[in-house]
Amino acid sequence: DKKQLIIDAAIQAPTAGNMTLYSIIDVRNQGIKDKLAQSCDNQPFIAKAPIVLIFVADYQKWYDAFKYYQKDNEVRKPDTGDFLLAYSDALIAAQNAVVAGESMGIGSCFIGDIIEQYEFHRDLFNLPRYTVPVAMLVMGYPAKGQLKRKKPVRFDSKYVVSVDQYEHFNDEKIAA
C-alpha cells in the first residue's frame, strides 16, 4: 500500500534525540475531510484527496510517560525549546512523506491553515494540551494540468543564504 510506504518514510525521518516528538493523524473519515476543506480556505481538493495526513508536534506522549515513571514527583512542563524541537521533528517527517510520495508519482500540497485555525482543528482532532497541528499534507495523483504547471519561482539564493552569520536586508538588496 503506497500510503503505508509514505507513512513509513515519514517515521524514518531524522528526529531530535530519537524522541519522535510528533504524531501523524491519517484522516480517512470523509466528514472530517469535508470539514478540513471548509476550515482551510474552502479548498475542495482537500475533501477529494485520497491521502490527508496531519503532522502534530507532540510533547504530550513524553509528558505522560514522564508522569508515569516519576509517580508522585512533579514533572517539568514542556517549554518553548521542547515545542521547537517537536515542530522540527513533525516538519522533517512531513517532508520525508513528500519525497516518498514524489518517488511514486504522488503529488502533495502543504496546507498552512491547519495552524491558522488552530483552535478549530485542536477540537476536531481531540488534541491534548501539549500538542499542536503544524502541517497538513494533502496527497494524490496530479491532474494533467498540474503536471504541466510551472513551479512557482523561488527566491534567489542570495536572499536566503548568509555566510557565517545572519545578514539583514539592506536597501540595496531590497531594491534589487
What are these regions (language model features)?
Residues 1-176:
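Acidic, surface-exposed loops and disordered segments
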